Amino acid sequence: GILRTLFIMTKDDEWKDEMEAFYRTDVAVPADLIVDGKLYKDIGLKYRGNSSYFSVSPDLKRSINVYLDHKDQKQKLLGYKTLNLLNGNSDPTFMREVIYSHVARNYIPAFKGNFVKVVINGESWGIYSHIQQYNKDFLEDNFKTRGGVRWKIGAGGGGSGTLRYPGEKKEDFGGFQQRTENAEEAWEELHQFTKMLDEAPIAELDKKLHGRLDVDGALWSLALECIFQDEGYFTRGSDYNLYLDPDGRFHLLQHDGNEVMSIPGGPGMPSGLQGPKLEPFYNADNEDRPLMYKMFQVPHLKARYRHHLKTITEEWISWDKIGPIVNQYAALIRDEVKKDVRKHSSYEAFEKGLVESSSDGRRTKLGLKPFTIDRREFLLNHPEVNLPSPKIASLTEIDQGKSAESYRVVAKTTGNTKAETVILWHADGFNEPYTPVAMHDDGKHSDGKAGDGEFGADIPSQLAGKKVRYYVEARSGGKEMTSDFYPARAEAGPLTFRVKAAKATDSVLRINEIVAENKSVAKDQQGDFDDYIEIVNTSGAKIDLSGKFLTDDDKNPRKWKFPKGTHIGAGERLIIWADENGNAEGGLHANFKLDKAGETIQLIDSDSDGNLILDEIKFAKLETDQAFRRIPDSKGNPSKGNPSPGKKN
């Protein structure tokens, strides 16, 4: 890894006093920043945090927000406009939150984390852990959008932040701190969601949550909080983030993890907790934690949570897995920690905290190594976790996933615990909710013989170019349902395929001619010499091109759509200008240009007609003003030659 140094130069020597005075205000202290030799002018500094502020004297390191966009809204550091510099309060290793983020990002949208050295006005302030800010940059990284609405439910969110329905008024949601500007209408969405969660009968909860909550993501998030003994929704019903995406679905996200892998002393943790022994279903009977209280009463959701808990523990909670990461981090920051005179604990506490637990007589501080080893032992041998379940041994895909075709999947189940129900889950789009399809062991779905433990089902036909995500769930019967998933990470790591466009066998439309570098052949309606594609209708009837597509990318066959009302007459030719100027008035202008070095151009049928490939041309390098055209016209194999736009070749 890389340990970067942030050189901060404040405008005033009294910067600490100013930052104290402006704590929890909108005022930032101005400064300049140098990183990797590059100067970032007019940044802003603010103290952040709660206990990491009040329990620390100003002469020791406090947590700091660095705002790159304090004056210049476009200024960013390596793509990010806000830096969260955390002081390692209550963590002499500085590593807990970075490790937590590293693991969590395998299962949920979670913050990136690393370490930096900070120098202020020429004086070293030592090592800080650096955790990504919960802002629009985070949304873009994880949800591929900058839209939606963000809430933070702080440590003091308590009763009004637990997602229990608090009442009709916005003021009743006092624990929710909205982080998105100009989003008043989102309060009604939150109001309706908490009311639904409060009122929905258990028998209808699954249906009510579909499309309103990322259920699988919420269960992964709860499992992570339990495993790492995090002070979040799982324990205290606060100290978490909530995100409402542009499609109206809520996501339960992590807020911080500075006290994970320990025994936090705040509210919410069970009294008398000794060591890494937080129960896997702690708070499951607590009506003031409605997300768990309700979901854990739905047998298959409780089984899904149990599976996720076990999966994370088996994949990550092992010193063979965590140990090398700890050693790598320690090697990166050890020398600076040793020299750091602003840290809150000793260098000896840093080294000891990696591999040993310690006690001051009042409170035990768990070392990273003993926590990892003992937590794994506790959870994997816990009677609520170590339950027999069906096993999905393998998945077979029968079809290749072309447009206008379904995609058959066969799952083979094994083990002593019979799979009573097997479900194929699928979704298209990056953030779409999954749709369940019942799988059958009846010998009629490519599944061998009836009753042999093989189950088959089809993903319905999808639009060409769509990336389809899917996985399979096998559920047991019995009083305490258990589940298995293939792949094990379910929605956090599904199988995928991209739908390919199938070829039509009777198309009367032809790509007749292309020019990939037009310098003098023909001008478009705007007077520009642009690349062009010529299509010809070889039939004796007028054809409506509305909703059909042109593309130069077989992974995106629906790239440019013919506008509504576009027709081509019998025997006629039509020119489409490939100039990336789709909004130009007059003529047809595609949203891509041609590559004179060579590529493939496809004419794709409409969504309603299955996105079949009506015609395609693959061309090699073309010279300026050279055409690639069919000879004889509209019928022959294409070859290089002289252009004749709008006329017979």
Residue spans for each PLM region:
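Extracellular acidic, Ser/Thr/Pro-rich low-complexity tracts
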Residues: 409-418, 428-430, 476, 537
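Middle-to-C-terminal accessory/interaction subdomains
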Residues: 3, 14, 23, 38, ...
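Internal "kinase-insert"/substrate-recognition segments embedded within catalytic cores
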Residues: 63-73, 80, 87-88, 106-111, ...
